[in-house]
Regions:
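Alpha-helical adaptor scaffolds
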Residues: 94-95, 115-192
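N-terminal topogenic membrane-targeting module
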Residues: 24-124, 143
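Long, non-transmembrane cytosolic or organellar matrix-exposed soluble domains/tails
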Residues: 183-266
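Extreme N-terminal leader/anchor segments
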Residues: 1-19, 29, 33, 37
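Specific register positions within alpha-helical solenoid repeats of the TPR/Sel1-like families, i.e.
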Residues: 62, 132, 162-164, 198, ...
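Short coil/turn linking the two alpha-helices of tandem helical-hairpin repeats
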Residues: 65-69, 135, 164-169, 201, ...
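Alpha-helical repeat scaffolds
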Residues: 100-110, 137-146, 168-182, 204-213, ...
């Protein structure tokens, strides 16, 4: 909002000045419009520079946390902990501490919200993923209403929340936001949705989702799940082959807890 306001003022002042100085309305209008766009560009570059500095701070926190987790893993290999659960709790604490630090850093974007109307929705989308990792689903639901859903992860989180709340818009959201994905993203999204439909005993919808995804992906898990459904082996449907990508959605817990020690940090 401020960007447009300041640009309009700068353009108007420049237009008036050059109209008077050059005694030409045409040149005055041209210079005014040029000043407007140049002002917008300079403000955008300034915001990008400031945002870049914050992003580097966030990346530093993530890298430090990953390094600490790696050191713990090496330590566990040398001196195994008393139980896998204890090791998992230590790793999750490292992850959660990093997530909370990242959320604090996200607040540094706030002063620039008034300069870029899309920035709040972009940062909210980032916070959605962070709060989801912390399993603070109430905050996730609140932020999803004010987020820009551009990346696959955020869209899948919304799909999960719609499923968990038995929201009737689940099918519409999947068809409008996730059916056009290709490759691994498309395969994973289709298998997540199909898993939900199997749980709801809507097998035809599950098969239809996988058939559509097969046109854009030859992912092994996708093909295996399609064969299971085609042969009516509904209880054998499994997304375990996607590993942590699947378990990080919290729809299922891994059968072997140790698998999650390698969970992706963010």
């Amino acid at each position: 909002m401020f960007t447009l306001f300041i640009s309009l003022i700068a353009g108007a002042v420049a237009g008036w000045f050059f109209t008077q100085d050059l005694n030409s309305t045409g040149w005055g209008v041209f210079c005014g419009v040029a000043t407007l766009f140049i002002t917008q560009m300079l403000i955008a570059l300034f915001i990008r520079f400031k945002s870049g500095k914050i992003q580097k701070e966030i990346e530093s926190v993530m890298q430090d946390a990953q390094a600490k987790a790696n050191r713990l893993m090496v330590q566990f290999e040398r001196r195994p902990p008393g139980s896998i659960k204890v090791a998992q709790q230590q790793l999750e604490k490292v992850q959660n501490d990093a997530v909370r630090k990242t959320l604090e850093l996200c607040d540094k974007y706030t002063p620039y919200y008034k300069w870029n109307l899309m920035l709040p929705r972009q940062i909210n989308a980032m916070k959605v993923q962070l709060y989801f990792q912390l399993r603070e689903f109430g905050k996730v639901d609140e932020l999803l209403k004010k987020s820009l859903l551009l990346d696959v992860r955020t869209k899948l989180i919304k799909l999960v929340r719609l499923y968990k709340k038995d929201d009737p818009s689940l099918d519409k959201f999947y068809k409008s936001k996730l059916t056009r994905l290709k490759g691994e993203d498309g395969a994973f999204a289709a298998c997540v949705y199909a898993w939900m439909k199997v749980r709801q005993e809507k097998y035809d919808a599950a098969v239809a989702a996988l058939v559509q995804a097969k046109k854009l992906s030859d992912n092994t898990v996708l093909l295996e799940n399609y064969d299971r459904l085609a042969n009516q082996k509904y209880k054998h449907f499994s997304n375990a082959g996607f590993g942590d990508l699947w378990y990080s959605l919290y729809l299922e817990e891994p059968q072997i807890k140790a698998q999650r020690q390698q969970q992706r940090m963010f």
